[in-house]
Amino acid sequence: MAAQCGGYMNQSDPGSNSERSADSPLPGSEDDSPGSAAPHDPEWREERFRVDRKKLETMLQAAAEGKGKSGEDFFQKIMEETNTQIAWPSKLKIGAKSKKDPHIKVSGKKENVKEAKERIMSVLDTKSNRVTLKMDVSHTEHSHVIGKGGNNIKKVMEETGCHIHFPDSNRNNQAEKSNQVSIAGQPAGVESARVRIRELLPLVLMFELPIAGILQPIPDPNSPTIQQISQTYNITVSFKQRSRVYGATVIVRGSQNNTSAVKEGTAMLLEHLAGSLASAIPVSTQLDIAAQHHLFMMGRNGCNIKHIMQRTGAQIHFPDPNNPLKKSTVYLQGTIESVCLARQYLMGCLPLVLMFDMKEEIEVEPQCITQLMEQLDVFISIKPKPKQPSKSVIVKSVERNALNMYEARKCLLGLDSSGVTITNQSTISCPIPMNCHGLDILAAGLGLSGLGLLGPNTLSVNSTTAQNSLLNALNSSVSPLHSPSSAAPSPTLWATSLANTSNATGFPAIPHLMIPSAAQATLTNFLLSGVPNYGQNTPSPPPGLTPVDVHMNGLHSECKKVTSVLNGHVKPTNMKYGTISSSSLGDKVLNTNLAEASRQSNNHSSAEEVNSKTDSEGCNDAFVEVGMPRSPSHSANTKDLKQMLNSTKAPCPTRQTVKLLHGTKNSHLHTAERLLSDSEMSPTEGPMTDKKAPGSERAAERAAAQHNCEMARFTSQSAYGNMQAYDYEQKKLLATKAMLKKPVVTEVRTPTNTWSGLGFSKSMPAETIKELRRANHVPYKPTMSTTYENSPMSLSRSNSREQLGNGSDSDNWRERNGIDSSHNDYSSSIGSPKRKQNKSAEHYLSSSNYMDCISSLTGSNGCNLNSSFKGSDLPELFSKLGLGKYTDIFQQQEIDLQTFLTLTDQDLKELGITTFGARRKMLLAISELNKNRRKLFEPTNIRSSFLEGGASGRLPRQYHTDIASVSGRW
């Protein structure tokens, strides 16, 4: 390691070089060693180590100028006080070209040698804070980075205080070229040098001129217009004749640190040369990436490249590995913006190696190393150095994760700071400076910054939905993130930069810095909000549940809230979030009920009595949660919910009110064990699934719910409609079906505001819709219920303008709409929930949660579709199985239900269904449906007649959500 830091190549100890007399101690250069006594003394030791050349030169210079202690005095004092002999290069040439660190030799008894070394290194230490970083830079671009006469790289070395080494082997070896560049110095300087090198890289964009005629001449690069563009945007323009004579290739050259000007100049040139055809001409560029890194960068099944292409819209082509000529050239094609962005993302996937020394006495437990590797998404290797009292540490990762590599070093060495500030982060790793300090490390830990998920395009492309996406992220749970890298997603999130720890070794503090997985899920969804195909696409909450007047400047304040939560409330023992918001809604409403609820936690029979009693009194005791958050970080948004509650005249007497309040109170009720149990939920379960663990907590909440139901029986029920929950999954399914349905030419399509403000549209910006609705003062009223008492086909009891029928207030959908259940077969498939509950009341009440109950009713595999599924479309099937988030994947691949029934496990893997649980559900559903295929596809489909106008066809059509999706009437 020392040799690499000194010479940056694997060299032998420089004992035989020309500077031996100056840089290394010579026998007899100091006082004579203690004769023959040394060999006979078993405790006699000799130790040779390097010291910092610049510090030693400074000491000698200061002594020569009479401004400080001379080297002679310094070493003589140590020899006398420690009873050792020290040999040092007294004739060191000051200002020599050599950058090698000189050696010091200390002889004496073991304890004395150790003490002398510590005293010398306390003044002349060179390696305690020195690191070496190896990065990948295409060998074809080395000369461009170095500059004429080495001017570019010299300037970088001077400004960063680092030594930068380019491989010497490239000069002589024409067959194999090395792309590895080494940077050695202090961590902050090394990271700054890495960023500077990336900025010095050339940026070359190319496009083909359209063929306007056979005899069309190649444009003159010296023409006034082209020269004006070149000078204005600091680019070089050249033309290359194509081999087939007609047309030419335009090559625009610039620098990475001038990216915006290069893009503007290319656009101007394209418009000048192609005119109206400019927008149709693709732009291309290429990257030279070592062939051995291709598979690593592409990811498993090419997932990295697919994500980048989907994110940017550019096409990326990796070469055939068997092509001997251009096996390392990667081609990118698309619009100017997409090509440049994809190029940045690819560079963020390039490998990085960080090397540094660790003291021999520092011991690191293997489990701590494993924990660090998982949390920071890095690889760590620690090996002892031969014949030296130190260890060599190697940390490997990718460029987008550079900050976490320094975090790993900080933790391993027990430092107070990583030595790298956020301002040093590369524009390639993160294309925008982040306003939220706390999210920098979070983004790096999730491996997102390199993919631009926190870049300017996130804010610009998705700015129309940023308001809802932020709140939606904080108000919902997400399935575990599928990391774009081939490594498995880490179960927890590292937040060392968010906590102030000054522990000497750094390792006892590790458990203090672990954020619960529930909070990680919230933060993950916050980071991924608005980004297609990353995480779960949860629809935006309706205006009735979350405020719609949040503006983009609220993003910064929300970031601060999240950061403050993490800073103040990551505790080592019971990770409660009880003090997140002292004025939280749950504190004010439920604090009087908690004690009694806990006393009743073990009285299960009394809870069952209350269940049956409140059912008869109309208080709904279904176990489906309302669409409110469980996340600990939600308490920051309780103010808006309080305002909504205050607008109602009396509290709601239903279980829904209680569960709505529990949504904010859960963060105070549950410990770290409860939070961790949430994170172990199957990734195939939807966000509306009840995720509570079985046991006393369930009993306590149920008892509290029943108590609140009894207390609320005497209050008014006028505000019931305003507090109904909203079934996002069902709405999203119906919207998907409506969008997939082909319009019938002869059918009149009547516009309604059924889908207004829900964010399901894929063609119109949500912000525009909101502005129109605000301008027209159109209020939003929820139109569906999520309770189990109301079937999925239920109509809301709110004041919605779509509500029709006989005006009955009955809980039953058919009774309110005047439809006799005996007339249709489909109604029996969904059944009356009360009948279902009566048939299996014992089983229903003994289940720990809603999903347990449902699985007991449907069968062991959860795919008993004989009577419950008679549809013919894939979205409905996936929604029923809790796999709604995978619907878009199958729609993009144009896979319908018929094709789905032919898929195998391997087919599902190729489609990108990497989660085993999701694939298992799909395969079980395929098996079940294939068994009943003949019955499933019978021509008689009573459901359609039921929806279009009842079994007889004479009932008036009901213009509500379900019919809008099936009949095509909007």
Curated annotation (Swiss-Prot):
- Domain SAM: where? 869-932
Give the GO molecular function terms.
RNA binding
| Key words, A-Z | Developmental protein, Repeat, RNA-binding
- Chain intervals with Polar residues compositional bias: 9-19, 596-605, 783-810, 819-831
KH domain residues = 130-197, 282-346
Region (Disordered) residue spans:
1-50, 596-638, 677-696, 773-841
Name of the molecule in the record? Protein bicaudal C homolog 1-B
Q: Per the UniProt entry, what species is this protein from, by scientific name?
A: Xenopus laevis
